[in-house]
Amino acid sequence: MRRCAWPLLRLSSRVGLALRHGGAVRLRQAAASSSSSSSGGGGLRAPDTSLFVPVPLKPVEGAAEEDVGAELTRPLDKGEVLKNLNKFYKRKEIQRLGTENGLDARLFHQAFISFRKYIMESSSVSADLHIILNDICCGAGHVDDLFPFFLRHAKQIFPMLDCMDDLRKISDLRLPPNWYPEARAIQRKIIFHAGPTNSGKTYHAIQRFLSAKSGIYCGPLKLLAHEIFQKSNAANVPCDLVTGEERVYASEDAKQASHIACTIEMCSTNTPYEVAVIDEIQMIRDPARGWAWTRALLGLCAEEIHVCGEGAAIDLVTELMYTTGEEVEVRNYKRLTPLTVLDYALESLDNLQPGDCIVCFSKNDIYSVSRQIEARGLECAVIYGSLPPGTKLEQAKKFNDPNDPCKILVATDAIGMGLNLCIKRIIFNSIVKPTVNEKGEKEIDSITTSQALQIAGRAGRFGSSFKQGEVTAMHRDDLLQLKEILSEAVPPVKAAGLHPTPEQIEMFAYHLPDATLSNLIDIFVSLSQVDGLYFVCNIDDFKFLADMIQHIPLNLRSRYVFCTAPLNRKEPFVCTTLLKFARQFSRNEPLTFDWLCRHTKWPLAPPKNIKELVHLEAVHDVFDLYLWLSYRFMDMFPDAALVRDIQKKLDDIIQIGVCNITKLIRASQSGAAPGAAEVMSEGFPLSRTKRDARTVSDHRDAKSAEPLSIALEVPGERRAKSLRTYRSATRQEDLKSHGRGSLANRLLREGLLTQEMLRQLESEWQDQHRSGRYGLASKRNDQSSSKEMGKKKK
């Protein structure tokens, strides 16, 4: 220990001498040997130090070994030590030197607090530090001599300071093409099939896929991958299906076929193919999943890559391929059937026709519209995002069947891709929907031109019974805005998504072994550098799961896999199940079929209300989660085949519920299910934004009391007008669908309210909304009248 003390003693004396006689300029040279790296390189942005979490450093308790410093000098006077430490902290030269060594004001303060606490609470300190502190207290040294010890302590609690250059190199995302050496080793031919929905662009790419000796199809949805899987095998081209949850072999002996249809996240960048097809390439800009399209485009090892999607992505794909030295051939396609935007809105559900599809952007609207259609004696199919793929296909089959009495479809934008539907007319119930901005915050905004065209293009599909498609809106005011949206050019795709790889996170963890996975990701994104062609995808879902399972002891690779699980974090039951999966996994206890059945209470009965239907959908997601994990940890999730069997049975149960959805809605709204109102409010009207801090229950209470008055800050006159229109329409629908709910019925039964009074209340409610008062004007009138009365009394 004594031999180790002298180098720092000599260095500290040089530091003190430099500060006292040469200032900060000479001090930089003196301290150079104590700093292995600096936090900021030339021209690099400063890291976000608020993400740097200090590593706890416990004070030395008890004399584990003899106190050499006290033997060489004398015991320290802690009072004098504290005074001199505070002097050290206030020295401007020390603060400036800390900045040059990567300690900004925040880190400097945190490091000093930890340094002072360590010295004051330790029963003994290292011999070299003890000698320096003793010299300072005796007047033989200067407080500046503490800087090397302070910097050493700072690097112990902030280990990233000592490896900032390495961390910057690891998180440098400016050359993604270099991540795929196998693809760079061959000269690939890129063919871009550009065109609108229903133009045949994907058909031509698939024909080349089928004629190739080997090929891979990469799609955004399991439904699309399954469709290509079936088409390929039907054409006598053996094709395997690979999704996150399963692998289906074309041959009975489970031998890998030369063709593969997969979801895009599952494509291999190491296997060589003759032809690759990347579908819906415009999703390369998606804030959450865009990285998967970037990875496929840059990394697929195929002689020919056929890219299908909107023409808005042509320029970006061309620029990306320029960086790889590959040229892009563009083939443009036009729509095969005409699509007409009608000059009149639907205005009433009484005007529905066979082949109509009403598009809603919330579950609440789905439920409301479905019940109103049923009240008119019509049957309707229902499709929304959280339904299992099998149920979606069954509902689509029911709607497409010319012999089925179901001629109306009520759906969300989930119909935009993945389903073949015989739709004559698309009717937008609204033109606003929830969106996620660049910061990961949810906002309410008008649908984009790309979204509107994707949905509208489902009408009049080529080969269906309707030779042309029609598009309109539910409300007259929305139709004007819809026409404007559809007439605008789709803005070009400007950047491609990127996501840190497991290898990059592992290298980060090597340098920062005490950091949490969530903190590692934050620091990675903070230090990452991307050029103008790329952006880092939103990682909020990943961080949410990382924080949720942080307390469970898992190795980094397993923890990373659990955090990439595809689940909806808004579903508490699914999140809780993932937590239980991770906990049992950490104990090295296999998650068996029996365990899963006990957890999900299988077997399950058909739903009696909406709340039970939503729970069944969550259970289906849990089965998906089990299958997804079984694909990655086969030994720990051994019963995938059994789970897949009961998942098919659950599909049938959910299908029964969806077929009777109007009965479930009635049961929920009549109060048959406790808590059903909360489920119904899941898709609350879109006038609620992230700026409205009220809870769902507050929203429900407000609906029963008075109309909502929520100020929306949406840029643009068109958006503001469309939001006002939608809010008005939503309230009218709420009046029709909820106004005669349990409270109204009770008042009618008790004789406190008549039908005429109820109609008058509805009329007054709508009039109040149109005037924009919502009780505010009456309140002001009451205040002014009370003042006048007060004056008269005086």
Swiss-Prot record:
Region of interest: Disordered? 678-741, 764-794
- According to its UniProt record, which cofactors does this protein need? Mg(2+); Mn(2+)
Give the location in the cell: Nucleus; Mitochondrion matrix; Mitochondrion matrix, Mitochondrion nucleoid
Recorded hits in Pfam families, A to Z, give: DEXQc_Suv3, Helicase_C, SUV3_C, Suv3_C_1, Suv3_N
Q: Which GO terms describe its cellular component?
A: mitochondrial degradosome; mitochondrial matrix; mitochondrial nucleoid; mitochondrion; nucleus
Stored InterPro entries: DEXQc_SUV3 (IPR055206), Helicase_C-like (IPR001650), P-loop_NTPase (IPR027417), RNA-DNA_Helicase (IPR050699), SUV3_C (IPR022192), Suv3_C_1 (IPR041082), Suv3_DEXQc (IPR044774), Suv3_N (IPR041453)
Residues bound to ATP: G195, P196, T197, N198, S199, G200, K201, T202
User: The Helicase C-terminal domain covers which part of the protein?
Assistant: 341-506
Q: Listed GO molecular functions?
A: 3'-5' RNA helicase activity; ATP binding; ATP hydrolysis activity; DNA binding; DNA helicase activity; double-stranded RNA binding; RNA helicase activity
Q: What reaction gets catalysed by this protein?
A: ATP + H2O = ADP + phosphate + H(+)
Query: What is the first-listed, main subcellular location in coarse terms?
Result: nucleus
Task: Domain (Helicase ATP-binding): give its ranges.
Answer: 182-322
Q: Where in the sequence is the transit peptide found?
A: 1-30
What's the Enzyme Commission number for this chain?
Answer: 3.6.4.13
Q: What class of enzyme is it?
A: hydrolase
Superkingdom of this protein's organism: Eukaryota
Give UniProt keywords alphabetically. ATP-binding, Helicase, Hydrolase, Mitochondrion, Mitochondrion nucleoid, Nucleotide-binding, Nucleus, Transit peptide
User: Which residue stretches does the UniProt record annotate as biased composition, category Basic and acidic residues?
Assistant: 689-704
Provide the GO biological process annotations.
Answer: DNA recombination; mitochondrial mRNA catabolic process; mitochondrial mRNA surveillance; mitochondrial ncRNA surveillance; mitochondrial RNA 3'-end processing; mitochondrial RNA surveillance; mitochondrion organization; negative regulation of apoptotic process
Q: What's this protein's family per the entry? A: Belongs to the helicase family.
Question: What is the protein's known function?
Answer: Major helicase player in mitochondrial RNA metabolism. Component of the mitochondrial degradosome (mtEXO) complex, that degrades 3' overhang double-stranded RNA with a 3'-to-5' directionality in an ATP-dependent manner. ATPase and ATP-dependent multisubstrate helicase, able to unwind double-stranded (ds) DNA and RNA, and RNA/DNA heteroduplexes in the 5'-to-3' direction. Plays a role in the RNA surveillance system in mitochondria; regulates the stability of mature mRNAs, the removal of aberrantly formed mRNAs and the rapid degradation of non coding processing intermediates.
Protein name, UniProt field: ATP-dependent RNA helicase SUPV3L1, mitochondrial
